[in-house]
Amino acid sequence: MDILNRKVQNASVTGVNCSLPTKEGARKIPSFFIGECGLDRVCATPYDLQLSAFEAQIRFSEDLGCPLLLHCVRALDDVLRLKRGTTQPWVWHGFRGKPQQLQQLLEHGFYVSFGFRHNVDSLRACPADRLFLETDDTPEPIAMLYAEVARIRQTTPEQLNEQCWKNLTGL
């Protein structure tokens, strides 16, 4: 089971408006994360609009007391800057970076979610208590990913699932 895809609440950018539900409305939605949100220097949406929307989503996450599920492409420095002063956990979705980038994220308190496309050295280096797994846009079942990651990390899929569940419920 892909635990990060449980009950994810989306906030979207439309034109120049960041469309977020009210706090009262959001509290009625059975959600656990705010996201997927973040910054992407490759997408067509102007970066300044993305930045404004992301800042609003961060405030929303803080106001509601919900963890933030983060999408980031080529914007690490801005994300690390914006993470300072926040209290809610952030989960980096689809991490493919090098161990040096992983270390930066861990130093800033991030949790890291890996999919089928990952850097093996980063996957090995990620502490178990900061690890999540996801299928995202691949058709393969999550059980295949658990088996692959368990082999790489020299554990069992069952132990890996227990750890990821513990991480999720600890957020």
Q: What name fits each language-model region?
A:
Residues 1-171:
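Mid-domain alpha/beta scaffold segments of enzyme catalytic cores
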